[in-house]
Amino acid sequence: MRRLKSILLLFITLPVLAQSEFKLTDQVPLDPNVKTGVLENGMTYYIRHNEEPKDRASFYMIQNVGALLENDDQNGLAHFLEHMAFNGTENFEGKGILNTLQNHGVAFGRNINAYTAFNQTVYNLSEVPTTHDGLVDTCLLILHDWSNYLLLTEEEIDAERGVITEEWRTRRNASFRLRNQWFPVLFKGSKWAVRDIIGDTTVIRYHEPSTLRDFYHDWYRTDLQAIAIVGDIDVEVVEQKVKEIFSPIPAVKDAKERPTFKIPSHDETYFVVATDEEATQSSISVFILEENNDGKPKAYEDLKNHYIQSLYNSMTDMRIQELLQKGEPPFIMGSTTMSGFVRGYDAYSITATANPNNEAKALEAIMTETERIKRYGFAESELERAKTNFLTELESHYKQKDKISNDSYAREYAEYYLTMTPAPGIDVEYEFANQILPTITAEEVSQKAKEWIKDDNRTIVITGPTDAEHLTEAEAKSIITKVESMEIEPYVDAAGDASLIDEDLTGSAIVNTRKLDAFDAVEWTLANNVKVIFRHADYEKDAVSLVAYSDGGTSKVENDMVPSAGMAQTFVSAYGVGDFDAITLQKMLTGKKVEVSPTFSSLTEGFNGSSTPKDFETMLQLVYLYFEKPRFDEEAHNALMSRYVAYISNMAKNPQKIMQDSLTYILSDYHPRVRTMDPDYLTDVDFKEIESIYKDRIQDAGDFTFFIVGNIDQEVVKELATKYLGSLTDNDREENWVDRGVRAPEGKTDKVIPIAFETPKANVNVTYVNDIEYNQENILAMKVLKGILDLRYTESVREDEGGTYGVRVGSGLSQYPVERAQVKIMFDCDPSRTEKLKSLIYQEINKIIEEGPTDVDFNKTVSNLLKDRQQSLEHNSFWMNSLYNYYYSGINSADPANYEELLNEMTKQDIQKFAASFFEGADLIDVVFKPKE
C-alpha cells in the first residue's frame, strides 16, 4: 500500500473506474503490474516496468536481517556488514562496485546506498541508466554478489573499523543518548532493549573477522532475501536474467530458524526519566504498545483499519494545532496518535514538548485532549473534512501515477516482502478507498480511542536536560489519574465555510504580450504593471506552481528591525489571511490542495504557491488576500512567540547550534546585521514591526514578477491572472535592494573554539570565499569542482584514513549584491586526528591546482551532472527554475548550449585553471571546534 500517511478520503465525483466489489475478508492482492516469483533457493523477486525517471532503473537487495539477529559478540556487525558490501565482492574487488557505477553517473551516497535497521538491511542502486549496454546486467551481478559473495577480507574489514567508529561518533548526539536510556525500559525483557544498530565500539574495533563472517553465513541467505528491480526495462527479459543469475546461488544448509522478537506484555505502567547535558527540550511521552499482524497476509479489513487510523490521526492533529493557536499554549508541540512503531507492534503515542520546568502543565494538557477524544470522540463535521482532504491528496496521486518513482515502488515492495504491508497498486487502492470511505462513521473512528488508550503495556517516558526540573513517577501517574476523573467539556467544532473573497474584482487588461520562444512560454504585462510569465508543463499532471518576486527584501530594513524582518515570513503565515485566522482558513480550504506563503530573503520579497489545476483560482485568491488584506493576529503572534521562547530557552547547550551560530558570525565578520536566534533576538521581534515591514514589502504589485508553470490551459491562466493579479494595487514605486556590506573576513582567519561535547569529537570547517564572475561557465565549473572534491575526500579522508564518516562539501556562486563564490568543507573526527586529516583537505586542493583532477574523477563528475540534468528535464520544476533564473540572473540555463554543450566541451585542464583562479588569493576561514579540556 502506498502509505499516504495522515490523509483520508471522501466519495465525490471521480474519474470513471471499473467498479469492483471488495469483500473485507478477502486478501489484498499484490499489484498486478509487478512480476513476482520465488526461486527454488528461496529468493523472492519483484520486477516492474516504470518510467519515472525515463531511461533509468533502480535495483534493491532486501535482506530480512538486522541488528536483532546479532549475538552479544556481534553487537553492531549487522551494520558493519552493510558497509562491507561496498568493499569487495567476488566480481567487484575493492571499490569495484562504486568505481563501475560512478563512471556512469551513479553517485555514491545519493544513488548508491544502504541502511540497516533492527530487523532488515536494504541496499539500493538508484537512477541507473538503462540505455547503456550491459549496465542492467552489471547491477544484477552486484545484487548477486551482495546475496552470497562478499569477500570480507581482513584488510578491508580493518580499514572499515575507523569509518564506522567515526559514524558512531557523529551520530552520538543527545537524542541518541537519551533513546539509549529509555529504550531499555520501553522494551524491557526483549532484545529491542539491548540493541541500537550502530553497536558497541569495542566490538566494532576489535571483533575477529571470523565473527563477522559467521554472521554473514548465518543470515545472508536466499530464503531471507528479495530483490526488486523497477524501471525503464523489459520485464520479461529481466525476469529471465534474474532466473539465470540468481538461481545458482546455493541455499544455506541446516539454516538457523529466523526468530521473531516479542516484547513482554505488562499490566503495570513503566516509568523512566532520561537526561542529557546537551538536551535542549523537556518531553513527556506515554507509549501504549499493541501487537499487530506484521508478517501476516492482509485482508481489505486491514486496509480499512489503516484508513481509520489515518483519519483519526489527521483529526487529532487538527485539534492540537487549534489548541496551540490561542492564548498561552500549554506546551510547545504535542500529538496524540496511533501508528506503526517497530516490526510487530503499533504504539499509541501521547507526546508533548514542555515549556521549561513545566512538565506537569504539558502532561495534563495533552492527556486532557486525549481523554476528551476518548470520552466524546469526533464530530461528523471533523470526519468529513478529514475524508475530503484525503480524497484531494489521493486523487492528485492517482492522476500523477506516472510520476511515482522507481524507488517508491521498490521501497513499497520491500515493505511488502518484510511485513506484508498491502501493495495493491494505486488503481486498486483508489477504487477501494472510494467505496469504503463513505461507510466509515464518526462513531466507528471514535470507538478506536477506547480500544487504543488503555492502562496495560503503557510506559511513561520523560526526557530532557540534566539540570531541569522533571516529574517524578508518582507525580506523572497522579496527573494521569486526575485527568481520567476530571470534568472535561466536549470539543466544539467551529464551521469554516465562508467564501475567501466576497467583493467584485475589476481586474486589469493585458497591455503587452511577448512570446518567449526559448522556453515555449509567454509573458503578459497587465495594466497595473504586474508581469506574469506562464509556461504550460504537464510532466506533473495535477500540479501548478507559482513563484513571485520583487527586489528589495530585508535589505531595506534598518539594523534594529532585522529580528522582526527575519521572523516575518514565519509569523505572517501563522496569522491567517483576510478575515480568517489560520485554523478557520485551514477548514475553509478543506478539499483543496493549495498552499501560498509569503517569502522574504535579504534581497527580494515574494510568494511561493502550489495547487492542482482545479484549485488554481483559490491559489490566486490567496495571493490577492496576502497583498490587499493581510491579517495581523496579535493573539496568534503571542501564542507562537511563547512557543519559540520556550523552544530556544535551552538551545545554548546544543553543540550543533553553538557551532552553527559561531560560524554565522565568523563568516559575516561579525556584521551588526547578522544575528542568530537566541532569547535576545526574540525579545527584539515586535508584532507592530512585523506588520510595518510586511506592508512596506508586500505592496506595489507593479514591481512584482509572477511565474506560473503547470498543467493548466493558457486561456484559464490569462482570465484568472487578469482578474486577481490584475486587481492588485500598483503604487508606481521603483526600488532595488540595498548592499549592506555583509562580507566574509579578508585574508586568512584561523580559530580553534572549545566546546563542551558530551561525546568527544572535533568539528572541522574550512571555507574559501573569492570574487568571481557570475556566468554559466563558472557555475558549471564550480559544480564539477565540488563533485571532484567529494570523490577525493571520500577516498582520502574516509576510506584511506578511516578518519571520518563523511566529508561534506558545499559550493555556490552568488550574483548579488556582489559576484562571489564560496566553497565550504566540513567533517567530524577524533580530536586527536584533527590536524592530520585537515592537512589532507588542503593537500587535495593543492593537488588539483598543481596537477589537475584525474581523468577518472573528472569523468565521473561530469557523467553524474549530465545524468541528473537529463532526469530534471522531465519535471515542471525545471522550467520554473529556468524561467526564474532567466529573469533574475539573465541566464537561460535551459538552453543546451548553456549546460550540456558546455559540460561536454569542458576539460580537466579547465577545472585545474578554474581551481587555481578561485583558491589562490581567496579569503580562507579555518575554524575547528574541539572539546573543552
Which residue stretches match the model-derived regions?
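Sec-dependent signal peptide recognition
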Residues: 2-10
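Proteolytic maturation boundary segments
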Residues: 18-47, 234-298, 302, 306-307, ...
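M16 family metallopeptidases and their MPP-like homologs
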Residues: 48, 53-70, 77-78, 95-145, ...
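Non-catalytic, conformational "gating/processing" segments within enzyme and secreted inhibitor domains
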Residues: 149, 154, 161, 175, ...
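Hydrophobic, small-residue-rich alpha-helical packing segments that form membrane-like cores
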Residues: 156-211, 215-224, 229-230, 235-243, ...
